[in-house]
Amino acid sequence: MGNILLQLLAVVALCIAPARSDWLPGTATFYGGADGSGTMGGACGYGNLYDQRYGINNAALSTPLFNDGASCGQCYLIICDYGKAPDWCKLGKAITVTGTNYGGWCNATRPYFDMSQPAWENIGIYSAGIVPILYQQVKCWRYGGVRFIINGFNYFELVLVTNMAGSGSIVSMSVKGSCTGWIQMTRNWGANWQCLAGLAGQALSFNVTSTGGQTIVFDDAVPAGWSFGQTFSTYHQFDY
């Protein structure tokens, strides 16, 4: 009897927790099939989400959440709003997802998550299709360090930054070749940052500031002699 009472108290605590001011209302549905394979790729540019260590717990974000790609890589804790949809919500369940795609075609002006089906089924009944939710942005946890994927050609470098912990996203970034000073980069699309410079053959360092306000200098993250299309892992990671 004592164990049952403790379980009931835990459920009640979960039900009232969303009343805190750091929870925001929204809606969620799902896409990508039962195995989530249809969520690979997307407007953040991550490609295969397993290769980039994001996995199946991902979501496409509506226009205000996506913020023209500035929110790519951010993490969100989501629960189904049981008080509004008791027949369709799974009581006491929560899931953390990473924003990896743009889903602006759904409720474009409102907070909306188009989640992978496996992630969505943690919180909602499949037949519901769409449910009211409560969400909050949370710290991202990643295995290993930040990774840089170098694409582009000649005098155009396009750098995809992946596996970023902390706030999960970037507010500013610059690059320095072994023969240059620091060059400011700009967001091209999603999590891809660009610069127009001839850096081929040079070792590359990156100065990255997260949306949480933390700056890390990745000295010689890319060794001299690199080629376009290569991925480079680091030992550094963001805390916020």
UniProtKB/Swiss-Prot annotation:
Residues 1-21 form the signal peptide. One of its GO terms (biological process) is plant-type cell wall loosening. One of its GO terms (cellular component) is extracellular region. It is a peripheral membrane protein. It is found in: Secreted, Cell wall; Membrane. Residues 155-234 form the Expansin-like CBD domain. InterPro entries: Expan_Lol_pI, Expansin, Expansin/allergen_DPBB_dom, Expansin_CBD, Expansin_CBD_sf, RlpA-like_DPBB, RlpA-like_sf. Residues 41-145 form the Expansin-like EG45 domain. Keywords: Cell wall, Cell wall biogenesis/degradation, Glycoprotein, Membrane, Secreted, Signal. Pfam families: DPBB_1, Expansin_C. Glycans are attached at N107, N207. May cause loosening and extension of plant cell walls by disrupting non-covalent bonding between cellulose microfibrils and matrix glucans. No enzymatic activity has been found. May be required for rapid internodal elongation in deepwater rice during submergence. Belongs to the expansin family. Expansin A subfamily. This is Expansin-A20. It comes from Oryza sativa subsp. japonica (Rice). The lineage of its organism: Eukaryota, Viridiplantae, Streptophyta, Embryophyta, Tracheophyta. The gene is EXPA20.
